Amino acid sequence: MFLDCTGFKKVLSNAIPGNDWTTPGDMLFVNSAVASQINYKDDNESQHPYVDAVAHDLGWIWKTPIKDRIGSGLCYNSSITSKQDAEDAFVEYWGKDRLRTGEFNHIDFTPGYNAKNWRANVIPVGLSSGFVEPLESSGLALMINCMAPLAGCKLMESIHQNI
């Protein structure tokens, strides 16, 4: 048994004939994101235990508050918005003075998932199994969905008993 943890490359999963990658592209219109680190305005700015998702003309913005900064990004459709336009909109939203480093991380992705998670002796895990959008909640759901069949298999019971 092999776990394919090779991310977007899906090295092991793609080697198996009949890889049924399902992309709901007609329902999910974003396929790119620009992300950066944002400074808090001041010490009183809220640090809360959830991610904000904010609608934007180009798509949507996520804001993940952590101890000393905010992780944020703008999801957009690259077929109608350039990387530069996305960066400009992101800076306009936050203000140039809030950017922590001035550096941007561009992420291009194809939303989708494996129609069947366990094929032959390969189980794709994490980004190898699918990617819907850059929020951890969907990634965690895909991870749990991939690992659930493994948790109940006889091989895992045998391994657990011998530990």
Predicted segments — roles?
Residues 149-163:
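Active-site-proximal substrate-binding core of FAD-dependent oxidoreductases
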Residues 90-97, 154:
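Hydrophobic, Leu/Ile/Phe/Ala-enriched alpha-helical segments that form helix-helix packing faces
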Residues 63, 117-135:
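Short FAD-binding loop at a beta-strand-to-alpha-helix junction that anchors the flavin cofactor
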Residues 54-57, 84, 103-108, 116, ...:
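Conserved structured core elements
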Residues 131-151:
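A conserved FAD-binding loop/helix module that cradles the flavin
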Residues 97-124:
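Flavin (FAD/FMN) cofactor-binding core of flavoprotein oxidoreductases
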Residues 1-93, 147:
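Predominantly flavin-linked oxidoreductase catalytic cores and closely associated redox partners
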Residues 10-13, 114, 132-134:
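Short catalytic/ligand-binding loop motif for oxyanion handling, primarily in non-cytosolic enzymes
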